[in-house]
Amino acid sequence: MLIYDGSKAYENLQTAIKKRTFRFPAKTEKDYRDGLLLPSLEPRFTLTSDQKIFTIGSCFARNIEAELTGRGFDVPVAKFVLPKDEFRHPGPHMLNEYNAGTILQRIESVFGEFRYSDEMGVEAVEGGYLDLFLHIHQQPVSLERLLERRREIAATYQELASSSALVITLGLVESWFDSLHGCYVNKAPSKSLIQKNPGRFHFHRMDVEDVLARMNACIEIINANMKTNIVLTVSPVPIEATFSGDNVILANSYSKSVLRVAASLLYEKFDNIDYFPSYEVALSKGTAGFAGDNIHIDKMLVKEIIAYMVQNYVTGRGTDENAPPPVSHYVDREIKNALSR
Protein backbone atom coordinates (compact mmCIF):
# COMPACT_ATOMS: atom_id res chain seq x y z
CA MET A 1 0.00 0.00 0.00
CA LEU A 2 1.25 3.46 -0.88
CA ILE A 3 0.68 5.85 2.04
CA TYR A 4 1.29 9.62 2.08
CA ASP A 5 0.94 12.08 4.93
CA GLY A 6 -2.10 14.28 4.31
CA SER A 7 0.04 17.37 3.63
CA LYS A 8 2.13 15.46 1.11
CA ALA A 9 -1.02 14.26 -0.64
CA TYR A 10 -2.17 17.87 -1.11
CA GLU A 11 1.30 18.83 -2.36
CA ASN A 12 0.95 16.07 -4.95
CA LEU A 13 -2.43 17.43 -5.99
CA GLN A 14 -1.11 20.99 -6.35
CA THR A 15 1.84 19.81 -8.41
CA ALA A 16 -0.43 17.76 -10.63
CA ILE A 17 -2.75 20.74 -11.16
CA LYS A 18 0.21 22.86 -12.28
CA LYS A 19 1.23 20.12 -14.70
CA ARG A 20 -2.40 19.60 -15.79
CA THR A 21 -2.16 15.90 -15.02
CA PHE A 22 -4.39 15.40 -11.97
CA ARG A 23 -7.53 14.38 -13.87
CA PHE A 24 -8.56 13.16 -17.30
CA PRO A 25 -7.95 15.89 -19.88
CA ALA A 26 -10.78 17.64 -21.66
CA LYS A 27 -10.75 17.47 -25.44
CA THR A 28 -9.15 20.93 -25.56
CA GLU A 29 -6.24 19.86 -23.33
CA LYS A 30 -2.70 19.07 -24.44
CA ASP A 31 -2.89 15.41 -23.33
CA TYR A 32 -5.73 14.76 -25.78
CA ARG A 33 -5.07 14.70 -29.50
CA ASP A 34 -7.14 13.34 -32.39
CA GLY A 35 -9.03 10.87 -30.23
CA LEU A 36 -5.96 9.72 -28.27
CA LEU A 37 -4.95 10.26 -24.68
CA LEU A 38 -1.22 11.02 -24.59
CA PRO A 39 -0.25 11.46 -20.94
CA SER A 40 2.55 13.92 -20.21
CA LEU A 41 5.70 12.03 -19.24
CA GLU A 42 8.83 12.86 -17.28
CA PRO A 43 11.30 10.20 -18.47
CA ARG A 44 14.04 9.10 -16.13
CA PHE A 45 16.48 8.80 -19.02
CA THR A 46 16.84 9.48 -22.72
CA LEU A 47 17.82 7.37 -25.72
CA THR A 48 20.04 8.27 -28.65
CA SER A 49 19.91 6.77 -32.12
CA ASP A 50 23.51 5.53 -31.85
CA GLN A 51 22.55 3.19 -29.01
CA LYS A 52 21.89 -0.52 -29.27
CA ILE A 53 18.38 -1.25 -28.02
CA PHE A 54 17.32 -4.80 -27.24
CA THR A 55 13.63 -5.68 -27.39
CA ILE A 56 12.07 -8.63 -25.61
CA GLY A 57 8.52 -9.67 -24.87
CA SER A 58 5.19 -10.18 -26.58
CA CYS A 59 4.19 -9.40 -30.14
CA PHE A 60 3.89 -5.65 -29.52
CA ALA A 61 7.67 -5.64 -29.00
CA ARG A 62 7.88 -6.47 -32.71
CA ASN A 63 5.93 -3.31 -33.55
CA ILE A 64 8.29 -1.26 -31.41
CA GLU A 65 11.49 -2.67 -32.89
CA ALA A 66 10.29 -2.25 -36.47
CA GLU A 67 9.58 1.43 -35.89
CA LEU A 68 12.83 2.02 -33.99
CA THR A 69 14.84 0.35 -36.75
CA GLY A 70 13.19 2.62 -39.29
CA ARG A 71 14.36 5.59 -37.21
CA GLY A 72 18.00 4.51 -37.29
CA PHE A 73 18.36 2.58 -34.04
CA ASP A 74 20.48 -0.57 -33.80
CA VAL A 75 17.92 -3.21 -32.78
CA PRO A 76 19.53 -6.69 -32.83
CA VAL A 77 16.29 -8.68 -32.72
CA ALA A 78 15.05 -6.91 -35.86
CA LYS A 79 17.92 -8.53 -37.80
CA PHE A 80 16.84 -12.09 -36.99
CA VAL A 81 15.73 -13.92 -40.15
CA LEU A 82 14.23 -17.33 -40.87
CA PRO A 83 13.44 -19.32 -44.03
CA LYS A 84 9.86 -18.78 -45.21
CA ASP A 85 9.14 -22.52 -45.12
CA GLU A 86 9.75 -22.48 -41.36
CA PHE A 87 7.76 -19.38 -40.52
CA ARG A 88 5.49 -17.23 -42.66
CA HIS A 89 5.92 -14.08 -40.54
CA PRO A 90 9.04 -11.88 -40.27
CA GLY A 91 11.77 -13.65 -38.30
CA PRO A 92 11.61 -11.53 -35.12
CA HIS A 93 8.02 -12.65 -34.51
CA MET A 94 9.31 -16.17 -33.84
CA LEU A 95 10.99 -14.77 -30.73
CA ASN A 96 7.84 -13.62 -28.94
CA GLU A 97 8.03 -14.17 -25.18
CA TYR A 98 4.45 -14.00 -23.97
CA ASN A 99 4.73 -14.41 -20.20
CA ALA A 100 7.01 -13.45 -17.32
CA GLY A 101 8.21 -17.04 -16.95
CA THR A 102 9.61 -17.31 -20.47
CA ILE A 103 11.05 -13.78 -20.31
CA LEU A 104 12.93 -14.73 -17.15
CA GLN A 105 14.27 -17.94 -18.70
CA ARG A 106 15.49 -16.08 -21.76
CA ILE A 107 17.30 -13.43 -19.72
CA GLU A 108 18.75 -16.07 -17.38
CA SER A 109 20.08 -17.95 -20.42
CA VAL A 110 22.05 -14.89 -21.56
CA PHE A 111 23.96 -14.86 -18.28
CA GLY A 112 24.37 -18.62 -17.89
CA GLU A 113 21.66 -19.15 -15.28
CA PHE A 114 19.29 -21.19 -17.47
CA ARG A 115 20.03 -23.70 -20.22
CA TYR A 116 17.66 -24.82 -22.97
CA SER A 117 18.50 -28.52 -23.03
CA ASP A 118 17.92 -30.50 -26.22
CA GLU A 119 15.06 -32.42 -24.57
CA MET A 120 13.17 -29.36 -23.33
CA GLY A 121 10.16 -28.00 -25.16
CA VAL A 122 10.28 -30.36 -28.15
CA GLU A 123 7.07 -31.86 -29.53
CA ALA A 124 7.12 -34.49 -32.26
CA VAL A 125 4.38 -33.97 -34.86
CA GLU A 126 3.64 -35.10 -38.38
CA GLY A 127 6.39 -33.73 -40.61
CA GLY A 128 8.97 -33.07 -37.91
CA TYR A 129 9.25 -31.26 -34.60
CA LEU A 130 7.88 -28.09 -33.00
CA ASP A 131 9.74 -25.90 -30.51
CA LEU A 132 7.40 -25.02 -27.65
CA PHE A 133 9.63 -22.10 -26.67
CA LEU A 134 8.75 -20.29 -29.90
CA HIS A 135 5.79 -18.80 -31.80
CA ILE A 136 2.55 -20.78 -32.10
CA HIS A 137 2.45 -20.58 -35.92
CA GLN A 138 5.81 -22.21 -36.65
CA GLN A 139 6.13 -25.05 -39.16
CA PRO A 140 7.57 -28.47 -38.24
CA VAL A 141 11.30 -28.87 -38.89
CA SER A 142 13.83 -31.64 -38.40
CA LEU A 143 15.21 -32.06 -34.89
CA GLU A 144 18.63 -31.10 -36.19
CA ARG A 145 17.28 -27.85 -37.60
CA LEU A 146 15.30 -27.12 -34.44
CA LEU A 147 18.44 -27.34 -32.33
CA GLU A 148 20.46 -25.35 -34.86
CA ARG A 149 17.83 -22.61 -34.77
CA ARG A 150 18.05 -22.51 -30.99
CA ARG A 151 21.75 -21.77 -31.30
CA GLU A 152 20.98 -18.96 -33.75
CA ILE A 153 18.46 -17.50 -31.32
CA ALA A 154 20.94 -17.77 -28.45
CA ALA A 155 23.49 -15.83 -30.50
CA THR A 156 20.95 -13.07 -31.09
CA TYR A 157 20.15 -12.88 -27.39
CA GLN A 158 23.83 -12.50 -26.51
CA GLU A 159 23.49 -9.00 -27.97
CA LEU A 160 21.37 -8.14 -24.94
CA ALA A 161 24.44 -8.11 -22.69
CA SER A 162 26.04 -5.28 -24.68
CA SER A 163 22.91 -3.19 -25.25
CA SER A 164 22.56 0.35 -23.92
CA ALA A 165 18.84 0.02 -23.29
CA LEU A 166 16.17 -2.66 -23.14
CA VAL A 167 12.51 -2.48 -24.05
CA ILE A 168 10.52 -5.18 -22.23
CA THR A 169 6.90 -5.70 -23.25
CA LEU A 170 4.65 -7.69 -20.92
CA GLY A 171 1.98 -9.58 -22.83
CA LEU A 172 0.02 -12.27 -20.97
CA VAL A 173 -0.42 -13.91 -17.59
CA GLU A 174 -1.72 -17.19 -19.05
CA SER A 175 1.14 -19.63 -19.46
CA TRP A 176 2.08 -23.30 -19.69
CA PHE A 177 4.55 -24.98 -17.34
CA ASP A 178 6.44 -28.20 -18.05
CA SER A 179 6.92 -29.85 -14.66
CA LEU A 180 9.24 -32.52 -16.08
CA HIS A 181 11.86 -29.96 -17.08
CA GLY A 182 10.83 -27.17 -14.71
CA CYS A 183 10.31 -24.55 -17.40
CA TYR A 184 7.70 -22.32 -19.00
CA VAL A 185 6.90 -22.57 -22.71
CA ASN A 186 5.36 -20.09 -25.15
CA LYS A 187 3.41 -22.49 -27.35
CA ALA A 188 0.72 -24.53 -25.63
CA PRO A 189 1.49 -28.26 -25.81
CA SER A 190 -0.98 -30.14 -27.97
CA LYS A 191 -3.85 -32.01 -26.37
CA SER A 192 -2.34 -35.29 -27.56
CA LEU A 193 1.03 -34.50 -25.94
CA ILE A 194 -0.74 -33.72 -22.67
CA GLN A 195 -2.70 -36.97 -22.83
CA LYS A 196 0.49 -38.95 -23.51
CA ASN A 197 2.21 -37.31 -20.54
CA PRO A 198 -0.36 -37.05 -17.72
CA GLY A 199 0.69 -34.68 -14.96
CA ARG A 200 3.56 -33.17 -16.95
CA PHE A 201 2.03 -29.95 -18.28
CA HIS A 202 0.09 -27.43 -16.23
CA PHE A 203 -1.75 -24.27 -17.17
CA HIS A 204 -0.75 -21.32 -14.97
CA ARG A 205 -2.69 -18.08 -14.75
CA MET A 206 -0.28 -15.81 -12.93
CA ASP A 207 -1.33 -13.20 -10.40
CA VAL A 208 0.52 -10.01 -9.45
CA GLU A 209 2.86 -11.80 -7.04
CA ASP A 210 3.74 -14.42 -9.68
CA VAL A 211 4.57 -11.83 -12.33
CA LEU A 212 6.38 -9.57 -9.90
CA ALA A 213 8.59 -12.36 -8.54
CA ARG A 214 9.75 -13.36 -12.01
CA MET A 215 10.21 -9.83 -13.31
CA ASN A 216 12.04 -8.80 -10.14
CA ALA A 217 14.44 -11.66 -10.82
CA CYS A 218 14.85 -10.48 -14.43
CA ILE A 219 15.78 -6.94 -13.45
CA GLU A 220 18.09 -8.06 -10.66
CA ILE A 221 19.98 -10.36 -13.04
CA ILE A 222 20.28 -7.59 -15.63
CA ASN A 223 21.44 -5.01 -13.08
CA ALA A 224 23.97 -7.43 -11.60
CA ASN A 225 25.60 -8.03 -14.98
CA MET A 226 25.32 -4.77 -16.92
CA LYS A 227 24.53 -1.09 -16.70
CA THR A 228 21.46 -0.31 -18.75
CA ASN A 229 18.16 1.52 -18.80
CA ILE A 230 14.89 -0.34 -19.25
CA VAL A 231 11.67 0.85 -20.84
CA LEU A 232 8.87 -1.34 -19.49
CA THR A 233 5.51 -1.44 -21.22
CA VAL A 234 2.34 -3.54 -21.32
CA SER A 235 1.19 -4.79 -24.69
CA PRO A 236 -2.26 -3.53 -25.72
CA VAL A 237 -2.70 -6.63 -27.91
CA PRO A 238 -5.36 -8.81 -26.22
CA ILE A 239 -5.21 -12.53 -25.64
CA GLU A 240 -6.41 -14.47 -28.69
CA ALA A 241 -7.74 -17.50 -26.81
CA THR A 242 -8.03 -18.32 -23.13
CA PHE A 243 -7.60 -21.63 -21.30
CA SER A 244 -9.05 -20.15 -18.09
CA GLY A 245 -12.70 -21.01 -18.78
CA ASP A 246 -13.64 -17.33 -18.50
CA ASN A 247 -15.04 -15.21 -21.29
CA VAL A 248 -11.97 -14.06 -23.23
CA ILE A 249 -12.89 -10.38 -22.73
CA LEU A 250 -12.87 -10.84 -18.96
CA ALA A 251 -9.76 -13.01 -19.06
CA ASN A 252 -7.93 -10.34 -21.04
CA SER A 253 -8.99 -7.60 -18.62
CA TYR A 254 -7.64 -9.65 -15.72
CA SER A 255 -4.39 -10.31 -17.58
CA LYS A 256 -3.68 -6.70 -18.47
CA SER A 257 -4.66 -5.47 -15.01
CA VAL A 258 -2.20 -7.84 -13.34
CA LEU A 259 0.59 -6.84 -15.72
CA ARG A 260 -0.11 -3.14 -15.31
CA VAL A 261 0.05 -3.36 -11.51
CA ALA A 262 3.28 -5.37 -11.69
CA ALA A 263 4.78 -2.78 -14.06
CA SER A 264 4.03 0.03 -11.60
CA LEU A 265 5.60 -1.85 -8.70
CA LEU A 266 8.72 -2.55 -10.76
CA TYR A 267 8.94 1.13 -11.70
CA GLU A 268 8.72 2.11 -8.05
CA LYS A 269 11.46 -0.34 -7.04
CA PHE A 270 14.11 0.12 -9.74
CA ASP A 271 15.59 3.52 -10.65
CA ASN A 272 16.68 2.36 -14.11
CA ILE A 273 13.13 1.41 -15.17
CA ASP A 274 10.70 3.75 -16.87
CA TYR A 275 7.11 2.81 -17.64
CA PHE A 276 5.90 3.75 -21.11
CA PRO A 277 2.07 3.82 -21.44
CA SER A 278 1.56 2.17 -24.83
CA TYR A 279 -1.30 0.18 -23.29
CA GLU A 280 -3.12 3.28 -22.05
CA VAL A 281 -2.62 5.18 -25.31
CA ALA A 282 -3.90 2.33 -27.48
CA LEU A 283 -6.96 1.68 -25.34
CA SER A 284 -7.90 5.35 -25.29
CA LYS A 285 -8.74 4.93 -28.98
CA GLY A 286 -11.20 2.14 -28.21
CA THR A 287 -11.81 -0.58 -30.79
CA ALA A 288 -11.23 2.05 -33.50
CA GLY A 289 -7.53 1.58 -32.78
CA PHE A 290 -7.60 -2.10 -33.69
CA ALA A 291 -7.74 -4.00 -36.97
CA GLY A 292 -10.84 -5.93 -38.04
CA ASP A 293 -10.00 -8.86 -35.77
CA ASN A 294 -10.01 -6.55 -32.69
CA ILE A 295 -6.68 -8.12 -31.74
CA HIS A 296 -3.95 -6.50 -33.80
CA ILE A 297 -3.25 -2.79 -33.39
CA ASP A 298 -3.93 -0.53 -36.37
CA LYS A 299 -0.63 0.25 -38.12
CA MET A 300 -1.17 4.00 -38.03
CA LEU A 301 -1.86 3.85 -34.30
CA VAL A 302 1.38 1.90 -33.80
CA LYS A 303 3.24 4.68 -35.61
CA GLU A 304 1.58 7.30 -33.42
CA ILE A 305 2.51 5.42 -30.25
CA ILE A 306 6.15 5.05 -31.33
CA ALA A 307 6.29 8.69 -32.41
CA TYR A 308 5.07 9.57 -28.92
CA MET A 309 7.80 7.35 -27.42
CA VAL A 310 10.47 8.98 -29.58
CA GLN A 311 9.19 12.45 -28.68
CA ASN A 312 9.63 11.71 -25.00
CA TYR A 313 12.73 9.55 -24.96
CA VAL A 314 14.74 10.56 -28.01
CA THR A 315 14.09 14.17 -28.94
CA GLY A 316 13.87 15.27 -25.33
CA ARG A 317 10.98 17.56 -26.08
CA GLY A 318 8.86 16.16 -23.27
CA THR A 319 5.91 18.33 -22.38
CA ASP A 320 4.88 21.23 -24.57
CA GLU A 321 5.24 24.50 -22.66
CA ASN A 322 3.20 26.26 -25.35
CA ALA A 323 0.23 23.96 -24.90
CA PRO A 324 -3.20 25.61 -24.55
CA PRO A 325 -4.26 26.48 -21.00
CA PRO A 326 -6.80 24.30 -19.20
CA VAL A 327 -10.45 24.92 -19.93
CA SER A 328 -12.14 27.04 -17.28
CA HIS A 329 -13.90 24.14 -15.53
CA TYR A 330 -10.82 21.89 -15.48
CA VAL A 331 -10.14 22.49 -11.77
CA ASP A 332 -13.33 21.96 -9.79
CA ARG A 333 -14.46 24.70 -7.41
CA GLU A 334 -14.33 22.26 -4.49
CA ILE A 335 -10.67 21.49 -5.19
CA LYS A 336 -9.82 25.17 -5.55
CA ASN A 337 -11.45 25.89 -2.21
CA ALA A 338 -9.68 22.99 -0.52
CA LEU A 339 -6.30 24.18 -1.79
CA SER A 340 -6.89 27.74 -0.64
CA ARG A 341 -7.81 26.81 2.92
Spans of features found by a protein language model:
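Extracellular glycan-modifying ectodomains
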Residues: M1-R341
